[in-house]
Amino acid sequence: MIDYVGVCNTVDWSKLILDIADQLPAEIGPKHKAGDPLPGLNQVTDMWAKAGYKTPDLGGTVSWDMFFPGVNFDQSVADKFAEYVGLKDINSCWISRIWPGYFAPIHWDVNDNEIELANQPDKLRWHCHIGKPEFGHVFIADDKCLYNQPQGATYQWSSRKLWHAGTNCGLTPKYILNIW
């Protein structure tokens, strides 16, 4: 389940985007490939293979950039947002960027530490639309399709493992902050 929280304006989202726009991302997704030994990964990669999804190196358009606090932007951004949503301990935080013409098909975010996480209670997750509303910036989580969201629009997820997808059929990069 996904619920609207409100508009977070404790961070200057436009300035943050300007700060990372010309940086190389810390990672380019999808990071994990079929056969990597992570619980839950094959569920995602098998589905993608069956549907014919491909990454750019194989002639496809499944790709997104990932920016991390302490690497690409100041940790205070994650801390301020965590305070806004009431998250006491940050497990993971990143900003995803999807370029025009690219997308992230249906998936849940399989984590490098999935084996350890399997022994812990599930965690809530939040995302924030940090870019201004733009034509073609679409985000789908659970049963909600989010489009033309105001800058700072924040949603809480009932699980970090919620199925979601994003696409950019617009003309400018699409940015979303994720945290759990």
Regions found by a protein language model. Give the residues of each.
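A short glycine-rich, His/Asp/Glu-containing loop-to-beta-strand
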Residues: 83-108
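Non-heme Fe(II)/2-oxoglutarate
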Residues: 1-89
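A short beta-loop-beta micro-motif enriched in histidine and acidic residues
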Residues: 89-90, 106-125
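Residues at beta-strand starts and edge strands
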Residues: 2, 122-124, 173-175
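Short acidic (Asp/Glu) patches
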Residues: 72-81, 104-115
